[in-house]
Amino acid sequence: MRVSRSGVFGVLLVVVVLATLGGYSFYRGYAAGASRLGRVMAWLRNPGAHPDWALQAGDRCGNAPFAYPTDGFIGFLWGDSFRPGHRHQGLDIFGGQELGQTPVLAAYPGFLTRLPDWKASLIIRLPQDPLQPDRQIWTYYTHMADEQGNSYIAPAFPPGTQELYVEAGTLLGYQGNYSGDPDNPTGIHLHFSIVLDDGGGSFRNELEIENTLDPSPYLGLPLSAETNQGEIPSCG
């Protein structure tokens, strides 16, 4: 989710218009998203004022199988929407530090791939879904580069890396703001998602929410916008 000034005003305008036209049931989801947007802006302005919002990389919530992949505040959830037809496919976690400073760790062991043209992204194959062992899934990590595409991915994973085994907690890189458009970078964060297998041993298109999974049970937190109507994700 981009958090440039123009983007913020655009999102708020969409929320107001849809609230007027769509009625309460339609508005409720957008209102929750707008509430999260306000918190993201507050966090980016002064992370130190909200230490209770932050999660620590490598920690786990109870018996959840995945560790938190990075430090920071989970600002936007799976299923969040700020325009008609769009639903966010994963989580946006904002570290609150400068570019290239907030570590990104593997949430679960698996086999890492970085495609040759990936400047900011990695994907890890999990041969057995820990919650449904009869299927294979993938964990996806992105925005690990600056606005010009200078990568913050760890040197151990150069472009073209294929099927390299990594343990949970392995350093993958650092949070960045790469969007593909140098004139409109994202806020500094990690986008993390869980992607379904295509049935042929590869991953589906992560840009479509139907190809991703609700991360709530994997991280033990309320991370679906459909059911989380403004709660700050925390363990306990």
Locations of regions flagged by a protein language model:
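N-terminal Sec-pathway targeting helices
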Residues: 1-17
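Hydrophobic alpha-helical membrane-insertion segments, chiefly the h-region
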Residues: 15-28
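Surface-exposed, glycine-biased beta-strand/turn segments
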Residues: 25-121, 127-129, 168, 177, ...
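Acidic, glycine-rich catalytic/binding loops that coordinate metals and/or anionic ligands
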Residues: 39, 136-137, 150, 156-170, ...
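Non-catalytic surface loops within mature trypsin-like serine protease
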Residues: 95-97, 128, 145-146, 192, ...
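A generic structural signal for short coil/turn motifs at secondary-structure boundaries
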Residues: 100, 148-152, 181-183
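Zn2+-dependent peptidoglycan hydrolase active-site motif and core
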Residues: 106-159, 188-189
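Active-site loop architecture of trypsin-fold serine endopeptidases
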Residues: 175-189
